[in-house]
Amino acid sequence: MEFHTFGDEDNKKVLLLHGMLCDWKKFRDLLKPLEESYYVIYPAMTGCYDGSADFVSFTDECAHIEDYVTENLDGKLDAVWGASQGATVLTELLARNRIKVQTEILDGVYLAHQGRLAASLGLRAFLKMQKNGGRISKVMQNVCKLMGLQNEDLAEFSLMYWGASASSMKANLIENYTYQINEAIRDSETKVHLWCGSREPYAMKSHKMLKKYLRNYTEKIWPDVGHGVMMYFHTDEYLDAIRAIVR
């Protein structure tokens, strides 16, 4: 994992974690205005940048974040935000409770099981897309339909990092589709904001699962949109929603 920082170090410290097999730089292009108000830390997940080792697990990614925050930020963050798989990783970070996080925003978190079959189908589709320069195959379209995604939701594929190895892709997909909630999350005192679109059935199922454990949370369902649509197509409104939370 690599870490990239921008903004005034005297401002609130906000960590922004990208989605599965995505390019942190493309997420920064959308989220960059936040750097005017916050000291922003963008991790690049293992396997998702040139010269990286292969991705192994969510726990490894959490350990990298914990080590960085402990060594560079006195073990504390004012807020963390994660999209899709980034949000899922942050649920594990919360459960581990090894650094202090005041506020957590989970957008499109996926914890409802889709299983190894979905991971296998996804791997085939990702490898084909990688070979075809990122074009969305029919297999991937079918996988996305199983996830409740529609055509506008597929814009998030433009944020992908296509240099990932087959090993990293496989490990990512297996983790993403088989990860189970770490029940230690019930001990966290962090304020958690659950976000998703009204057309995200798996994310909404995941919210229901998390509510059984979280002590302190709010829920925001964006009307008539799917996975990643608010960030990608309604960026200004989306950033304002983040600013309203992280004051």
Which residues make up each language-model segment?
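Conserved alpha/beta-hydrolase catalytic His-Asp/Glu region
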Residues: 115-117, 133-186
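Catalytic histidine-centered segment of alpha/beta-hydrolase-like enzymes
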Residues: 225-236
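Active-site loop/oxyanion-hole signature of alpha/beta-hydrolase fold enzymes
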Residues: 41-79
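Acidic catalytic loop of the alpha/beta-hydrolase fold
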Residues: 198-203, 228
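Short beta-strand/loop motif that positions the catalytic acidic residue
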Residues: 188, 194-196
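Gly/Ala-rich beta-loop-alpha elbow adjacent to hydrolase catalytic centers
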Residues: 81-90
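Conserved HGGG/HGGXW glycine-rich cap/lid loop of the alpha/beta-hydrolase fold
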Residues: 5-50
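Flexible "cap/lid" loop of the alpha/beta hydrolase fold
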Residues: 95-96, 101-132
